[in-house]
């Protein structure tokens, strides 16, 4: 056996205990950032999702699409406004959000999985009342706070051998659509399912002890660690809501949550199925 074949065999052998750990368990992957726009990275993410399903993982893909929404709004001469990182979503903006997220982005991802031989079903939180919400703040317009996840729809799809691909749009009791932060949607879905893991793909490697030093990655963090790092200012600015989303998921019953760099090919498989790992893991 040549060296490269030996390495391949070692990688496959290394994956066995992790596959055993995850088989039959729920894993929620939140997809966003540059990994959504680069064709090769996109293909590697879809391959990872499909492989996880093939080895028996109940995998669910949740996606955002902020850059695509902003680009379409610009084309339509509709100005984008943000408050504390949340898109102010008036009636016109909400129409564009639905068109881009539930239409273009969602169906494109479902088609990509299908092209690789997967059986994907693209849906948004409106479908079947999957994500029930109420208005977060009148000033923000159609921005929703999640009340409930209808897990039966997801279980029915997963039991039928399908991969749910979910865009982060919710619905209230009066049938009004709402824009939802995709990280939050993924965390609430993972918590409702008591998922084994949630993986958040981002444009960063994880939580850094020194934001200017890529080698200062914190590979594992407890809930108490996260609070201490926030107090000390190591977790600051835009990392605070992302970390809060991860720690809230753990508090609500998700066993492990990872922030990984989606710009690394096959980052999901490396994080979940090898000894190496890539990003920051949050646990109780």
Language-model-derived ranges and their functions:
Residues 1-263, 270-272, 276, 283-284:
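Nucleotide/pyrophosphate-binding catalytic subdomain
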């Amino acid at each position: 056996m040549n060296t490269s074949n030996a390495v391949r065999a070692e990688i496959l052998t290394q994956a066995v205990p992790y596959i055993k750990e995850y088989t039959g368990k729920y894993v929620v992957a939140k997809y966003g950032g540059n990994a959504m726009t680069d064709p090769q990275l996109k293909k590697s993410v879809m391959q990872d999702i499909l492989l996880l399903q093939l080895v028996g993982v109940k995998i669910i893909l949740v996606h955002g699409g902020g850059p695509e929404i902003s680009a379409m709004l610009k084309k339509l001469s509709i100005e984008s406004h943000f408050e504390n990182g949340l898109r102010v979503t008036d009636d016109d903006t909400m129409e564009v959000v639905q068109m881009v997220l539930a239409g273009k982005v969602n169906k494109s991802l479902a088609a990509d999985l299908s092209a690789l031989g997967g059986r994907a079903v693209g849906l948004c939180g409106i479908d079947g009342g999957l994500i029930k919400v109420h208005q977060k703040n009148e000033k923000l317009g159609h921005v929703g706070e999640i009340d409930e996840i209808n897990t039966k729809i997801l279980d029915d799809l997963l039991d039928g051998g399908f991969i749910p691909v979910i865009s982060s749009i919710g619905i209230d009791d009066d049938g009004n659509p709402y824009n939802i932060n995709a990280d939050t949607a993924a965390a609430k879905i993972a918590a409702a399912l008591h998922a084994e893991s949630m993986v958040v793909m981002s444009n960063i490697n994880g939580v850094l002890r020194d934001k200017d030093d890529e080698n200062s990655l914190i590979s594992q963090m407890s809930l108490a660690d996260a609070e201490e790092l926030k107090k000390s200012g190591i977790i600051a600015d835009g990392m605070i809501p992302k970390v809060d989303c991860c720690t809230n998921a753990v508090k609500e019953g998700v066993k492990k949550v990872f922030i990984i760099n989606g710009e690394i090919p096959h980052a999901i498989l490396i994080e979940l199925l090898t000894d190496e790992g890539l990003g920051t893991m949050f646990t109780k």
